[in-house]
Amino acid sequence: MLSQVYRCGFQPFNQHLLPWVKCTTVFRSHCIQPSVIRHVRSWSNIPFITVPLSRTHGKSFAHRSELKHAKRIVVKLGSAVVTRGDECGLALGRLASIVEQVSVLQNQGREMMLVTSGAVAFGKQRLRHEILLSQSVRQALHSGQNQLKEMAIPVLEARACAAAGQSGLMALYEAMFTQYSICAAQILVTNLDFHDEQKRRNLNGTLHELLRMNIVPIVNTNDAVVPPAEPNSDLQGVNVISVKDNDSLAARLAVEMKTDLLIVLSDVEGLFDSPPGSDDAKLIDIFYPGDQQSVTFGTKSRVGMGGMEAKVKAALWALQGGTSVVIANGTHPKVSGHVITDIVEGKKVGTFFSEVKPAGPTVEQQGEMARSGGRMLATLEPEQRAEIIHHLADLLTDQRDEILLANKKDLEEAEGRLAAPLLKRLSLSTSKLNSLAIGLRQIAASSQDSVGRVLRRTRIAKNLELEQVTVPIGVLLVIFESRPDCLPQVAALAIASGNGLLLKGGKEAAHSNRILHLLTQEALSIHGVKEAVQLVNTREEVEDLCRLDKMIDLIIPRGSSQLVRDIQKAAKGIPVMGHSEGICHMYVDSEASVDKVTRLVRDSKCEYPAACNALETLLIHRDLLRTPLFDQIIDMLRVEQVKIHAGPKFASYLTFSPSEVKSLRTEYGDLELCIEVVDNVQDAIDHIHKYGSSHTDVIVTEDENTAEFFLQHVDSACVFWNASTRFSDGYRFGLGAEVGISTSRIHARGPVGLEGLLTTKWLLRGKDHVVSDFSEHGSLKYLHENLPIPQRNTN
């Protein structure tokens, strides 16, 4: 065996350190079926990420974001993770995924250790096979599968199963790790090995030597000879956890080896405040030891020695010893493929045990507060909601100096880290704050007839009337980048529409967002609804927020097209309002006015090229090529220092063309523009439908018939005639402000203001009406009469 280790490229080590060790290498994988090898090779979608690893041990990590610095990691695989649902045999797919993730982390320079169950299940499968082989032909023919199970299970003693399964389990791990050029070593321990000082030193030395040589130790209790569990005791004045199961073994091993992180995988999502499956059970994101009294434990899992209570006790003991702990689900098919690497990357998976008490409410608690506050907000009178918004507008001007001081801190910290356009978005000024205040007062004025407005009234039958009324959507999550002025705008729209609101701003605007949120809550407090608008801590990952489908009803991203695409991809069961791209077109018709074209092109492209409603593709009618109008357009673009990209057709007309466009479906967001030639208005429409993003498209022409044809046939959220693309904006549309621009085809489209944040519900008022009254022989008949809609007093 030592020679095999040497042939793997490692130096041999002292033999006296090997009382429990069985090294496994590439030379002993002949007993594994080729199908298993192929299955392992199919798992290859985890990226290799290089991170600085400065930790060896010390205090446990305070936050999830610090877990990426963990160097030494123990992964404990529970019986429910390793075994199949029938508890006989191993779950090969899950094991293949786990081995791949462990290998990826090992190859990043981390020191990985596995504590695994599964020997009993593997041995049970093998012994059942032996029982079947030992039967006579007559017994085999007359014994059904269920009869075999009933006969076999009582006679299979767990220790015998463990003895029969250890070698096969290790051979399986060996074959899997071999695919990633990693060696593994098996170590079997009992509780006595931790209580005997000499054995503890030998075990510690063996593990350190294996880690030094880049070998993954695979540790398990020696279930073939394990004695009954002993009570927890003191070891030289230190509280010591007894090795009663693999949970306590993993905790004991993690502390003995001064491990940075212990990952405990089981068949539940993590630690709940009450038994999973109960109506009010909620997953605990961060567990602080002082909160133990708030947790109620249920029964243990379907297999294994311990339940969640045993896991928590082991986790708290490890945490006390300086090891961070995460308990997570290793069986869920949607997350198990990356659960280990996701935990190490700091993603919100399972329950993170921390000795640092969370400074504020969790995002789940914030979601509940926003829900409750939003419902209270919706019950206020329209005048009260308008009063809150007016008060917020006053605070923006009254507290101007404090706001600008906070914004100055953000700008100073961002200097040299952000590009000039982003710094411009980040910057606040007196004029910006004054414009914000004006916009908020417009929202307040338009909010008088929003929530509770009757859209339809129908008399179903005598004394049975139906109404359709507007109501808030619920809880909105608005994610925005670099623009702190977005916060009061969106907050005012949420207040006017009676929605609860979660705000997630970029860390580059942390100081500005903090003071603007405080002012928003101050305005809300005048009517006792302070909690309706919540600012999410910057530590929360956007991807984690997008998974809160039970907390959030609508996500509205405000930022780059890449941000929108990422959120649309990450959102799990939550609708996203927005547009991933703003590829806006302008078609210059053969009947276009010379004076209008250059003004419209300049304003659409050069006024604010980073905006989502800026012009990106200019379509020119072919009859305009080599005309004074075309020359004026090109000269103006050169003066404005706009880089031109030639489309394929346009390039064919030129002897010396600008750089040919790489893609006709490009949002430049800068002083760059694609020019392409089209044959007629229909050709322009076809081009827009093929390469556009359904955002904003314009025709420039003096021919009214051509213009109307374009307006009616272009399928975009905004279609203009002789107007700049930059008019595609909520403020310019008279909406007061907008939460974003939507290119979706349901609910809201184009600039989305107050109306886009409302939905409807039906109110039916009757007097002891039942459906059977309207049957063929019933006493009532359907009337379905449209009734007049009462006008609300908005003064």
From Swiss-Prot:
It comes from the Eukaryota. It catalyses: L-glutamate + ATP = L-glutamyl 5-phosphate + ADP; L-glutamate 5-semialdehyde + phosphate + NADP(+) = L-glutamyl 5-phosphate + NADPH + H(+). Pathway: Amino-acid biosynthesis; L-proline biosynthesis; L-glutamate 5-semialdehyde from L-glutamate: step 1/2; Amino-acid biosynthesis; L-proline biosynthesis; L-glutamate 5-semialdehyde from L-glutamate: step 2/2. Substrate binds at residues 117, 223, 246. The modification N6-succinyllysine is found at residues 311, 347, 550. The keyword Ribonucleoprotein does not apply. Pfam families: AA_kinase, Aldedh. This is Delta-1-pyrroline-5-carboxylate synthase. It comes from Homo sapiens (Human).
